[in-house]
Curated annotation (Swiss-Prot):
Pfam families: ABC_tran (PF00005). It comes from Methanococcus maripaludis (strain DSM 14266 / JCM 13030 / NBRC 101832 / S2 / LL). Belongs to the ABC transporter superfamily. Phosphate importer (TC 3.A.1.7) family. SUPFAM superfamilies: P-loop containing nucleoside triphosphate hydrolases. This is Phosphate import ATP-binding protein PstB. ATP binds at residues 37-44. It is a peripheral membrane protein. The gene is pstB. The complex is composed of two ATP-binding proteins (PstB), two transmembrane proteins (PstC and PstA) and a solute-binding protein (PstS).
Length: 251
């Protein structure tokens, strides 16, 4: 099984405050890896290290290495814009741009140099179909994306992410603002998307992690306490802290 991204001895600080301690975690290609743990445990910080989103915060420091196809993404010669094209991100709260559905999806491809209308039309249709939104919106692509429901907006954000053909999709609690039906649609979509993409999801919802992921990492106080196949971690955790967390004894 191919490792798509790998972290080796990753430590991270916000100013003086250390947020991650020696994280070693492989991310396997075409699998869903879930990161779980109590609030403030470091899981979202780690997720944002994977496409250098933390670079946007002043005073942060990272040591160790994170590789994408065996190339360290923190090397001096890495183009961060290109990295974020290859490693896309879907946030907790749906964040459609204040423009039409069509222009939301075409935004990334245009930035990366695609100007041909026919090509853009094809990308928009393809991405909306992949994100299970096409049938809902195909009659009115000029409609403002802000008029979509919360669940539709989140699927639009997924479509916008895949429109630039990433290798990896990062999802930071993508369902926490959604109702149960919208959540199930996003979960079904994730399982479908992993055929072509590698997915990493941060979630507070342990049932969600157990339903959709192939591998799970449990974080606590900046440490990766345990990493294993999801069915193994939830059924036979090797660490007492993991067992306490998933059985609801703390967190």
């Amino acid at each position: 099984m191919k490792i798509k991204m790998n972290s080796k001895d990753v430590n991270f600080w916000y100013g003086e405050k250390k947020a991650l301690n020696d994280i070693n975690l492989p991310i396997y290609e075409n699998k869903i890896t879930a990161l779980i743990g109590p609030s403030g445990c470091g899981k979202s910080t780690f997720l944002r290290c994977l496409n250098r989103m933390n670079d946007l915060i002043s005073g942060v420091k990272i040591t160790g290495e994170i590789t994408l196809d065996e190339k360290n993404i923190y090397d001096k010669d890495v183009d961060v814009v290109e990295l974020r094209k290859r490693v896309g991100m879907v946030f907790q709260k749906p964040n459609p741009f204040p423009m039409s559905i069509y222009d939301n999806i075409a935004y990334g491809p245009r930035i990366h140099g695609i100007k041909d209308k026919k090509q853009l039309d094809e990308i928009v249709e393809w991405a909306l179909k992949k994100s299970a939104l096409w049938d809902d919106v195909k009659e009115d692509l000029k409609k403002s994306a802000l008029k979509l429901s919360g669940g539709q907006q989140q699927r639009l954000c997924i479509a916008r992410t895949i429109a630039v053909k990433p290798d990896v999709i990062l999802m930071d609690e993508p369902c926490s603002a959604l109702d149960p039906i919208s959540t199930l649609k996003i979960e079904d979509l994730m399982v479908e998307l992993k055929k072509e993409y590698t997915i990493v999801i941060v979630t507070h919802n342990m049932q969600q992690a157990s339903r959709v992921s192939d591998y799970t990492g449990f974080f606590m106080l900046g440490d990766l306490v345990e990493f294993n196949k999801t069915d193994k971690l939830f059924v036979e955790p090797e660490n007492k802290k993991t067992e306490d967390y998933i059985s609801g004894r703390f967190g």
